[in-house]
Amino acid sequence: MPIMKKIRAAVVGYGNIGKYVIEALEAAADFEVVGVVRRASSVAAAGESKYPVVSSLEQLEGVDVAILCTPSRLVEQSAETALKLGISTVDSFDIHSGIADMRARLDVIARENNAAALISAGWDPGSDSVVRALLEVCAPQGITYTNFGPGMSMGHTVAVKAIEGVKAALSMTIPVGTGIHRRMVYIELEEGYDFDTVANAIKNDAYFVHDETHVTKVESVDALLDMGHGVNMTRKGVSGKTQNQRFEFNMSINNPALTSQILVAGARAVLRPKAGAYTMIEIPIIDFLAGEREDIIRRLV
């Protein structure tokens, strides 16, 4: 039997997602970790590490794919850097309103550099997007409601932490129903800052401005922290001319662990298509799975 050539992956960013991505890569037999890319200030303070820790992708050799674990607002810049080096990328960019435009911009860069970018490949957007598409296959006419939580939103929490005056933060997503959500934000305030001013800045951030948002000052965010999250997705629609077709999908998960697992599967899948930028619904689901295609078909079909 020929020796399988492993996919050489670089991890860009080493927060919660980056750490869980390393775990998922170590659990995947078809991957090897080339190294971790961090900010220069973090590299100096990294200490001993199982893998090389560098400040730029150029310092790593033979990278097949870069898994971008940066905050969403830094994803496009990180993707451009990697793609211009001819390195394919996968990310979990989660600002829904910006996905289509970012895909169009990265598509041009990816094609120019003979690489591929898989964007918004977390669980939502990402795997939930695939489920929503499949539900529309089953019932083309109808309504799908996606209800998140209750649970910790990684993207919203990171967005709050970036606001001036916030020392620590937790953003909880509470489902109201029919796709409507309430944001419960808990913050530790930096000394010298006015709570009302900081709370107003949070409520007017793009992550929160369209939802009912409550901001509460707390002594310790760590005392509240739970990385659990979940989703309930329902569709009621029509198959052919038959009414009242009902579908439901539920999951309760550790947020960064699932996001990271899907990112690693995406790192496998993004090496299959021709150059360009893609979302998860554009790539065959079989490409996300490890193993021989014929074996997968026999097992799942």
Regions found by a protein language model. Name each.
Residues 8, 19-20, 27-57, 151-268:
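C-terminal substrate-binding/catalytic lobe of Rossmann-fold NAD(P)-dependent oxidoreductases
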Residues 18-19, 75:
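N-terminal Rossmann-fold NAD(P) dinucleotide-binding loop
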Residues 56-57, 62-65, 72-94:
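Rossmann-fold NAD(P) dinucleotide-binding segment
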Residues 93-117:
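Rossmann-fold NAD(P)-binding glycine/threonine-rich loop
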Residues 127-147, 155-159:
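Rossmann-like NAD(P)H-binding beta-loop-alpha module
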